[in-house]
UniProtKB/Swiss-Prot annotation:
It comes from Methylorubrum extorquens (strain CM4 / NCIMB 13688) (Methylobacterium extorquens). This is D-alanine--D-alanine ligase. Belongs to the D-alanine--D-alanine ligase family. GO terms for biological process: cell wall organization; peptidoglycan biosynthetic process; regulation of cell shape. Binds 2 magnesium or manganese ions per subunit. The lineage of its organism: Bacteria, Pseudomonadati, Pseudomonadota, Alphaproteobacteria, Hyphomicrobiales. Its main location: cytoplasm.
Length: 307
């Protein structure tokens, strides 16, 4: 009898629609691999739903709070349902950008300088010397990210408005010029490195990530061999330092601009990367010789408790 997999998707975070895309793509691929699949749009009754379903494993395709911060992982541990991706601690740690940076820095991974500030204070005066980036402490998909370019710019006033829905504290970081890189990690190996070139603008914002034609993916990234290998080393070290399991994706910046610093820094580790067939991790896996079906099969067969 084929293994029964519950694909968890949707939820109630700001990344709901992205999660539905990931979940439906994974579900279709698993069906193609011969699994019995139940698509679960996660709501407040998720404990009851899973108790009644009793799947053999859960593929976690949720994004954002509750889905990648240790919450759903803790529930799955309580219900004794093996699951994919990282466990409770690694998920919670990676989701909190500042605490994740502290752990990565201790492991020798270069990260941008920065500090946590109250959003109202950041709206009154520059928390760092521009250029700098302000971002929510615990959001994905570049939600709420603001770049302040020079001293003449006013501090971002949206931080003090009712439109800001990403928490009272924000992370201000030194802006690192240069190239946007990402590296997929699968288990104990780094699969490959992609350079992301936004079609409009100079950084990989929400529209560049999810709008059709919003970015160009250069795979493998056109880097000197030593830099390419260093990106992979940093991604794998960050994955291991945070205690990640299964699939993760590290996002980095590399300043190779004329007269630049040459800095290569890890911005964050995403424990629940996008999982449509055209998402970054499946693209990198395909380039490494692993089809989308093979990738999701590996993820389900890797599922366990106590992650």
């Amino acid at each position: 009898m084929s293994k029964h997999v519950a694909v968890l998707m949707g939820g109630w975070s700001s990344e709901r629609e992205i999660s539905l895309r990931s979940g439906n793509a994974c579900a279709a691929a698993l069906e193609g691999e011969g699994y019995r699949v139940t698509r679960v749009d996660v709501g407040p009754d998720i404990a009851t739903v899973l108790t009644e379903l009793r799947p053999d494993a859960a593929l976690n395709a949720l994004h954002g709070p509750a889905g990648e911060d240790g919450t759903i992982q803790g529930l799955l541990e309580i219900l004794k349902i093996p699951y994919t991706h990282s466990g409770v601690l690694a998920s919670a740690l990676a989701m909190h950008k500042e605490r994740a940076k502290t752990v990565m820095r201790a492991a020798g991974v270069s990260v941008p300088e920065g500090r946590v500030v109250n959003r109202h204070d950041a709206a009154k005066s520059h928390p760092l010397t521009p250029p700098y980036v302000v971002k929510p402490i615990a959001e994905g998909s570049s939600m709420g990210v603001i770049i302040v370019r020079d001293e003449r710019s006013h501090p971002p006033q949206i931080l003090a408005s009712d439109e800001w829905v990403y928490g009272e504290e924000v992370l201000a970081e030194t802006y690192v010029a240069g190239r946007e890189l990402t590296c997929a990690v699968l288990g104990d190996r780094a699969l490959g490195v992609t350079e992301i070139k936004p079609v409009s603008g100079e950084w990989y914002d929400f529209d560049a990530k999810y709008a059709g034609g919003g970015s160009i993916h250069v795979l493998p990234a056109d880097l000197k061999l030593n830099i390419y290998q260093r990106v992979q080393e940093l991604a794998l070290t960050a994955h291991q330092a945070l205690g990640c399991r299964g699939v993760s994706r590290a996002d980095l910046r590399y300043d190779d601009t004329p007269g630049g610093t040459g800095a290569l820094v890890v911005l964050e580790v995403n424990t629940q990367p996008g999982m449509t067939q055209t998402s970054l991790v499946p693209e990198i896996a395909a380039h490494a010789g692993q089809s989308f079906g093979e990738l999701v099969r590996w993820m389900v067969e890797d599922a366990s408790l106590n992650r």
